[in-house]
Swiss-Prot record:
EC number(s) recorded for this UniProt protein: 2.3.1.129
Protein name: Acyl-[acyl-carrier-protein]--UDP-N-acetylglucosamine O-acyltransferase
Enzymatic class: transferase
Listed HAMAP family: LpxA
Localization (cell): Cytoplasm
Species, as recorded: Cupriavidus pinatubonensis (strain JMP 134 / LMG 1197) (Cupriavidus necator (strain JMP 134))
GO annotation, cellular component aspect: cytoplasm; membrane
Pathway note: Glycolipid biosynthesis; lipid IV(A) biosynthesis; lipid IV(A) from (3R)-3-hydroxytetradecanoyl-[acyl-carrier-protein] and UDP-N-acetyl-alpha-D-glucosamine: step 1/6
Function: Involved in the biosynthesis of lipid A, a phosphorylated glycolipid that anchors the lipopolysaccharide to the outer membrane of the cell.
GO terms of biological process kind: lipid A biosynthetic process
Length: 267
């Protein structure tokens, strides 16, 4: 049965599965739906039009579903959707969307979100990501599956971080990071710059030597040649056309991502 601490305040209109746990002094609002096996730690707030899936663990002092920090917001009924089996640690803040975008902030499943993380309005976070402590992403940011954000990193609004990419700790990111790429600060300051393909991460995820070699070639064309962006994109397209089926899949993801950039690619 649902375990609600006597000091918790759960609105009668909230929909909680039979085995949800709500800790001491926590607050659950009227438009909240929480799935089976999810636990809410002490002193946390879950509010807004928020849907949380199954098996999530929300730590103490988290604020989930708060109103967006956007001066254009006028109390529209925007949403936050969270998937399954996520860990959301203490003092994390996750806000609902705005009508200026899709009206929803989306968190996938199996994400590891550490302490003091901020996920702003209208963000889209995939599956199996890691947000190290104090990572902060501004509004409208997209984070792909298996991406890793280092501690105390900051991401500018509307930036995209591709699948399997990695952002180093204490880095400031203002442009898109292609899939499979490492971006981190360097000796010249905290602005994130490209640092190669995330080879170790790809090996751990089961990518083979041919796939990694193809991505390294694409990276060299984009970052280590004298080609313009359009010329590099065309050369990567030619590389994709010659690749076998296994190597082609990550190359296509890389090419499609850079072709769709609006803010430009991290340099």
């Amino acid at each position: 049965m649902t375990q609600i601490h006597p000091t918790a305040l759960v609105d009668p209109k909230a929909e909680l599965a039979a085995d949800v746990t709500v800790g001491p002094f926590s607050i659950v609002g009227p438009n909240v739906r929480i799935g089976s096996g999810t636990s809410i730690g002490a002193h946390s707030t879950v509010e807004g039009h928020t849907t949380i899936g199954q098996g999530n663990n929300i730590g103490p002092y988290a604020s989930v579903g708060g109103v967006p920090q956007d001066m254009k917001y006028r109390n529209e009924p925007t949403r936050l959707d969270i998937g399954d089996r996520n860990t959301i640690r203490e003092f994390t803040t996750i806000h609902t969307g705005t009508v200026q975008d899709r009206g929803v902030t989306t968190i996938g499943s199996d994400n590891w979100i550490m302490a003091y993380v901020h996920i702003a309005h209208d963000c889209t976070v995939g599956n199996h990501t890691v947000f190290s402590s104090n990572a902060q992403i501004a509004g409208h940011v997209e984070v792909g599956d298996w991406a890793i954000l280092g501690g105390m990193s900051g991401v500018h609004q509307f930036v995209r971080i591709g699948a399997h990419a990695m952002l180093g700790g204490a880095s400031a990111l203002v442009q898109d990071v292609p899939p499979f790429v490492i971006a981190a600060s360097d000796k010249n300051g905290n602005k994130a710059t490209p640092h190669g393909i995330n080879v170790e991460g790809l090996r751990r995820r089961g990518f083979d030597a041919g796939q990694i070699a193809g991505l390294r070639q694409a990276y060299k064309l984009l970052y280590k040649s004298d080609l313009s962006f359009d010329e590099a994109r065309n050369e990567i397209a030619a590389l994709l056309a010659q690749a076998d089926a296994s190597a082609a899949e990550p190359l296509r993801a890389f090419l499609d991502f850079i072709a769709a950039t609006q803010r430009g690619i991290v340099r």
